[in-house]
């Protein structure tokens, strides 16, 4: 099961770039959205969602 609740409260579009719309989850795991929001420290398993947007710097 996807640990991210974006599918219930918003949308996460992953690909070459990542966009989160109305994303209210506190963390974006790779299964939902591999991108780290601006100002988020890169990490292995995911990163903290800050705000409602993601930039193109992604966690690997």
UniProtKB/Swiss-Prot annotation:
The residues the record assigns to binding a divalent metal cation 1 are 4, 6, 20, 23
Q: Which residues are listed for a divalent metal cation 5 binding in this entry?
A: 33, 35-36, 49
InterPro entries hit by this protein: Metalthion_dom_sf, Metalthion_dom_sf_vert, Metalthion_vert, Metalthion_vert_metal_BS
Please list where the region (Beta) is annotated.
1-28
User: Which parts of the sequence bind a divalent metal cation 2?
Assistant: 6, 12, 14, 25
Instruction: Name the positions where a divalent metal cation 3 binds.
Output: 14, 18, 23, 28
Q: Where is this region: Alpha?
A: 29-60
Q: Identify the residues that bind a divalent metal cation 6.
A: 36, 40, 43, 59
Q: Which GO terms describe its molecular function?
A: metal ion binding
UniProt-listed Pfam families: Metallothio
Membrane spanning segments where? none
Q: Which PROSITE patterns match?
A: METALLOTHIONEIN_VRT
Residues noted as binding a divalent metal cation 7 in the record, renumbered to the chain: 49, 54, 58-59
Against Gene3D superfamilies, the record matches this protein to:
Metallothionein Isoform II
Residues that, per the record, bind a divalent metal cation 4? 32-33, 43, 47
> Which keywords appear in this protein's UniProt record, sorted alphabetically?
Metal-binding, Metal-thiolate cluster
Record's SUPFAM superfamilies?
Answer: Metallothionein (SSF57868)
Known function: Metallothioneins have a high content of cysteine residues that bind various heavy metals.
Record remark: domains: Class I metallothioneins contain 2 metal-binding domains: four divalent ions are chelated within cluster A of the alpha domain and are coordinated via cysteinyl thiolate bridges to 11 cysteine ligands. Cluster B, the corresponding region within the beta domain, can ligate three divalent ions to 9 cysteines.
The UniProt similarity line reads:
Belongs to the metallothionein superfamily. Type 1 family.
Q: What is this protein called?
A: Metallothionein A
Q: Which organism does this record belong to?
A: Notothenia neglecta
